[in-house]
Amino acid sequence: MLAAVAVLGGLALLLTAKSEGTAAHAADGGRAEIEAFNKKYIEAHLKMNNAAIMATWAEDGVGLLPGTAPMIGKATIGKFLNDVTSRMEGYHMQKVEMDFQGISVSGDWASEWAYEHQVVQPPDQKPVIDSYGKLLLVLHKEADGNWRVTREMWNQGMKP
């Protein structure tokens, strides 16, 4: 009887260890997927490629910027982005840095925040725009397997 209990106890430990290992592997895989998403997200912003930026957004995404009403839906966010960049003829993004922190993945949902730094060169030799901010993203892995932004909140930061 004790041998049977010991065997059952051993099996329970093995099953627990296996499920914890599987969960850890899934979390590691999720983190790697988020890190890959982040590289695409940064690259799209560096190139000022509105189509690539919008490809990172969910249809029902919400953008939260200071001093503005929430931008609800991909179409609204895309219009805002196009309006802003249409007023930036001749501007060149020289640098985009996003230092992502606190990456947390739970199934098909993830969140992270970042320190953000952009350097933009205006036309006509005007002084560069050197800005800092903080960013919070909530991401969802959609049916097509791609992670997309469902919520983004940004605010002005200070130079570290």
Residue positions per predicted region:
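N-terminal Sec-pathway targeting helices
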Residues: 1-3
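Short, low-complexity N-terminal intrinsically disordered segments enriched in polar/charged residues
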Residues: 6-56, 160
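A short acidic/glycine-rich loop-to-helix N-cap element
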Residues: 25, 123-129, 159
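A solvent-exposed, acidic/Ser-Thr-rich amphipathic alpha-helical stretch
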Residues: 28-35, 50-105, 115, 127-131
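Beta-strand elements of well-folded, non-transmembrane domains
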Residues: 118-122
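Short beta-strand edge/turn micro-motifs at domain boundaries
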Residues: 132-160
